[in-house]
Amino acid sequence: MPEQPGGPDGGPTVGSTPPVDAGSAPPAAGGTTPPTGPAYLPGYAKSQLTAPDSGYEFDLRAGRVVPAETVTWYLARDGHAFLPSEESDAFVAEGSAPTPADCVRGIESRPAATLPFGALANARPFCVRSPDRNEIAIVRLVAAPADGSVTIAVDQYRRN
């Protein structure tokens, strides 16, 4: 018998991370199932980043803090709100643990025009999709003290 990939039952092996299917959605109203998209694989997880002031942005692709206007997929601070890069899409999640599939469905059905800190209190997650639509960041506001710094926690996913 040929050896099966993964564990003995063909499933993932211990320590492996299975891909997350962007299209694994329940049927929509009317009984249709949304189209299935390529799976999103975990990139980096639980990265906590602090931008000292508005001269810095969060590089969502690399998971680091960079000087403003130096990367194409970013999250910037604009007063008391976040400002995603141009051509990025955002969605403020209802639950506490959205998946990439939840983010895609939310972005495509209820995109967020603004991301004010007040709406994101208590680490309420929000999603930002890259301009090329191949990456998703699930972001939580950790702190936004009056001194101008902002701290976030980010999980990033990318398509195969």
Predicted regions and their residues:
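N-terminal "domain-start" segment
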Residues: 2-117
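Extracytosolic low-complexity repeat regions of secreted or lipid-anchored proteins
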Residues: 96-160
